[in-house]
Structures are given as C-alpha cells and as structure tokens.
C-alpha cells in the first residue's frame, strides 16, 4: 500500500469489505454449493436431471420468494438484462412503449425500443439523475416500463399500475431491486432481473416473472410475421423454462449460486426478511450521511432513496476518488460512483448478503479516511 494512503485500523474494518453494486458480495456458502456439486452437476448435460433440477430450484424458489399469483411463470434465458431488453422489444412490445427514464439503466430499454425499426417511437418521460418521474400511462402505448431501482443513481421507484394502463403491460426492470425491495408481483406483468445484485451470483442470466397477460402477448406477437433471432425468442424461453431448461447452455455455476442464495433468503423469512435487512442497512448509511459535516445523500427525496444502492455526495473539499482508493487499498472495495454520473460521491451496495453492521463499520472507515487524508 502506498505510504501516502492512510491505514484503517483493523477494529474499524467491516468483516467483509465488498460493497459493490453488481457484481456484489457472494457468500462463502454459495461457493461451497458449487464445490459440493463439482462432480454431480458441474460438467454434465443441461438437458438432464442434475442441471434441470438446479433450474427447478431457482424457479420454485423465486415463486415462493415473490408469492407468485396464479398463472404467473418464472422464465429464464441467457444473456442478462441487456439481452432481455432486446428480447422484450422483439417479443413484448406490440407497437409502442412508454419508458420512465432517470438514469443510465432506465434509459437503456428506451434506447432499444427507439432503435427498433418495427416499433413506433416510444413515449419517454424523464427526470434528472437523483430524482424520479411519477409512473404514468398513455392510451397510445401497449407497454409501460421503468426501473424498480436505478443502479446508477441510487433511486428507487415503487411498483404500482399507473391509472389508465389497463391495455398496457407493466414491465419492471428489477435488476438491482429484485430480492431487496418490496413488491406485489400482481402489480406487474413483467418483473425482470439478473442474479448478480441481490441474488449474489454471477451475471449472464436473465429472469422474467411473467403474468398471464404477458404470456398471452408473447404468444400473440409470435403468431405474427415479426422476425426474431432464436437467441432472443421469448416463446422459446417460455417453452424451455417450463421444462426447467434454457435454450442454450447456461452457466451452471451461476445457477448453483443463484439457487443457494434464493433458498438462504426463503429460509430466513423470504422477501419480508430481505426488505427489512436492506432497510436496516440503508438507514444506517443515510442516517450517518445526514449527520455528517461532509457527506450528503445524493437523492434528496427520502422516499426515493434506495435501500439497496446508496449514493453519497462528499463535500467538494474532499476527493471522493481518493477516499475510494484508500478504502480499496485497505481491502474495502467497489465504493466508486457510477462512472458516467460524474459526481464527487461514493456508491454503496447494500444487498441482502451484506451485513448491516458492516455498513456501520464502513461509515466509520470513511470518517477515519476523511480525517486522515491531507
């Protein structure tokens, strides 16, 4: 470690120094679950029972975690949320979408539908980073989408069906919110996410919880002459998922870690337990920032401050990049802000795998570093 960077006393450090916003902290037990399956599951066919059973554990576990209503299905595919945006443009938007955008990731799906030559230009309702627009509807659209949690800015937006949206699917990007924020799945038609945030696994897989209306839309569009690459085909994903399979070979270790994390969550009380845990962690972070003379929550509206991704602005006299660098040199990693936001801030992951007490210790470390830096 450079002599110019302060050393953080051991008694201040968190038990685990991983605070990334995805990939996020992986529990040792998840790695052990992969090791335990080294010869029984790893390196075996994804069309046979051992791997299909793991996919089934993921699907059944998510059904329990989110208390799925009758007729909702857990659908899996390869490629992560980025691939799902393309799949949704091909297979869920009939003609025109409405997007709420308030950061880097909530804007990405809007860019996809805007660029799709077979769709009309979307309606885009925007808000500045750090704030969020009110969910709304438009009679001209057949899908309304927004992010449950905007990972780039630390803004969360509750999930509820906008008034007048009866003819539109409600599609929620829950990439960093699923498993850590409250949701009533019946308020959504498509609740999609990836496993590298709250579910403490690796990326490269997408999950979409689909309502009967969404499944009908998939079948409806599939019956038209709209071309779609097989890899992005939602009918193919729906059919394979019903068999506890994916269209092409999945990352089996990712699924093993994913399944273990879901079961860990359910064993402790399910989504209610997860939400209470992230509420505990985030209250520790925001209470500290509000009491600090150099730190301020970036999101000014308390109701929009994320329970899973905390963004904290630092006073201009303090170099946040130097603080993050010092933390990293002391084994406390991934507190840097989202690169494109360009703010003097820290960004802290507070997913269920992260111990609330470690968040408290992190704040003490930040105080120490700021006090020691020239």
Task: Mark where each language-model region is.
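Active-site C-terminal subdomain of aminotransferase-like
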Residues: 25, 196-286
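Conserved PLP-binding catalytic core of the aspartate aminotransferase-like
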Residues: 296-326
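PLP-dependent aminotransferase-like
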Residues: 82-83, 87-142
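Active-site phosphate-binding strand-loop segment of PLP-dependent enzymes
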Residues: 126-179, 190
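Conserved N-terminal alpha-helix of the aminotransferase class I/II PLP-enzyme fold
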Residues: 38-87, 108-112
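Conserved active-site segment immediately N-terminal to the catalytic lysine
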Residues: 185-196, 206
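N-terminal "arm"/small-domain region of PLP-dependent enzymes with the aminotransferase-like
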Residues: 1-45
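PLP-dependent enzyme catalytic core of the Aspartate aminotransferase-like
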Residues: 2, 11, 16, 340, ...
